[in-house]
């Protein structure tokens, strides 16, 4: 859904790096090079960005169930 603010393992702040990571991927960086450019050296922090699935845009397409009027 939304990228976590901190790494689950070490507690480093990573929430502010998501947009920069996506922009680096847009300009043809590889995943590893983009993470290196963001100074994410620990594998626990790297996995937080690599394994994140951004579902918020897909979920916004659904509306809550409307109540039926009699």
UniProtKB/Swiss-Prot annotation:
GO biological process per UniProt: transcription by RNA polymerase I; transcription by RNA polymerase II; transcription by RNA polymerase III; tRNA transcription by RNA polymerase III
Keyword Nucleus (UniProt): yes
Alphabetized Pfam families for the sequence: RNA_pol_N
GO cellular component: RNA polymerase I complex; RNA polymerase II, core complex; RNA polymerase III complex
Keywords: DNA-directed RNA polymerase, Metal-binding, Nucleus, Transcription, Zinc
PROSITE patterns, A to Z: RNA_POL_N_8KD (PS01112)
Entry keyword rRNA-binding: no
Superkingdom field: Eukaryota
Binding-site residues for Zn(2+), renumbered to this chain: 7, 10, 44-45
Function: DNA-dependent RNA polymerase catalyzes the transcription of DNA into RNA using the four ribonucleoside triphosphates as substrates. Common component of RNA polymerases I, II and III which synthesize ribosomal RNA precursors, mRNA precursors and many functional non-coding RNAs, and a small RNAs, such as 5S rRNA and tRNAs, respectively. Pol II is the central component of the basal RNA polymerase II transcription machinery. Pols are composed of mobile elements that move relative to each other. In Pol II, RBP10 is part of the core element with the central large cleft.
UniProt similarity note: Belongs to the archaeal Rpo10/eukaryotic RPB10 RNA polymerase subunit family.
Matches recorded under NCBIfam families: PRK04016.1
Description of how the protein assembles with itself and partners: Component of the RNA polymerase I (Pol I), RNA polymerase II (Pol II) and RNA polymerase III (Pol III) complexes.
Protein's name in the database: DNA-directed RNA polymerases I, II, and III subunit rpabc5
Species whose genome carries this gene: Dictyostelium discoideum
Name of the gene: polr2l
């Amino acid at each position: 859904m939304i990228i976590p603010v901190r790494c689950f393992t070490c507690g480093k702040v990573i929430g502010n790096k998501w947009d920069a990571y996506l922009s680096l991927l847009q300009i043809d960086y590889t995943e590893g090079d983009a993470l290196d450019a963001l100074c994410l050296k620990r594998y626990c922090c790297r996995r937080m960005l690599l394994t994140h699935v951004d579902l918020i845009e897909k979920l916004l397409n659904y509306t809550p169930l409307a109540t039926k009027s009699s």
